[in-house]
Amino acid sequence: MNLNKTAIVTLLSLATLIGFGGSAIAQNAMGTHMNGDGTDMSHSQGKYSGKNSMANLTTEQQAIRQQVLNEFQASTADMRQQLTSKNYEYKALLTSKPVDEQKVLAVSKEIQTLRDSLYQRRVSMDTQLAKAGIAMTGNHGSRGGNHMGMAGGRGCR
């Protein structure tokens, strides 16, 4: 009788674990950085702009757009790396004991300066594309747009 109780409890525990585990995996398939169609949004311009974002552009416009985007990525690579480093430094300062409010404030100002510079470069890129007759694709203000407003950004800081 004791063996039967142990076997039943073990089987029920295993079934529960498998049931809840499968449910957790199924719900976690689409994280906050994923589009509804399961594609990664980290380099896209919005939810509906994936592979077909340049479908309405001529071959010349596609080449110009790609060149401008490549130039933007190359020209802002160091700035984006600095921004990442400053964000890590900011988080480290907030978790240090005691918290040095002056250092935190100074780093936050550096972060804001980098963000402003990056945004100005983005505006220049958008202007360059507009002058070439290439409309912006995607959603630049929310959920995955490169301007990262609303839920696509990292929240308030």
Curated annotation (Swiss-Prot):
Cross-referenced Pfam families, in alphabetical order?
Metal_resist
Q: Which residues form a coiled coil?
A: none
The UniProt entry, under Gene3D superfamilies, shows:
1.20.120.1490
| Compartments, record wording | Periplasm
UniProt region (Disordered), positions on chain: 136-157
Q: Which InterPro entries match?
A: Metal_resist (IPR025961)
Gene Ontology terms: cellular component: periplasmic space
- Compositional bias ranges of the Gly residues kind: 141-157
From the UniProt annotation, give the residues forming the signal peptide: 1-26
Q: Which UniProt keywords apply?
A: Periplasm, Signal, Stress response, Zinc
Known function: Part of the Zra signaling pathway, an envelope stress response (ESR) system composed of the periplasmic accessory protein ZraP, the histidine kinase ZraS and the transcriptional regulator ZraR. The ZraPSR system contributes to antibiotic resistance and is important for membrane integrity in the presence of membrane-targeting biocides. ZraP acts as a modulator which has both a regulatory and a chaperone function. The zinc-bound form of ZraP modulates the response of the ZraPSR system by inhibiting the expression of the zra genes, probably by interacting with ZraS.
Entry's family note: Belongs to the ZraP family.
Listed name of the protein:
Signaling pathway modulator ZraP
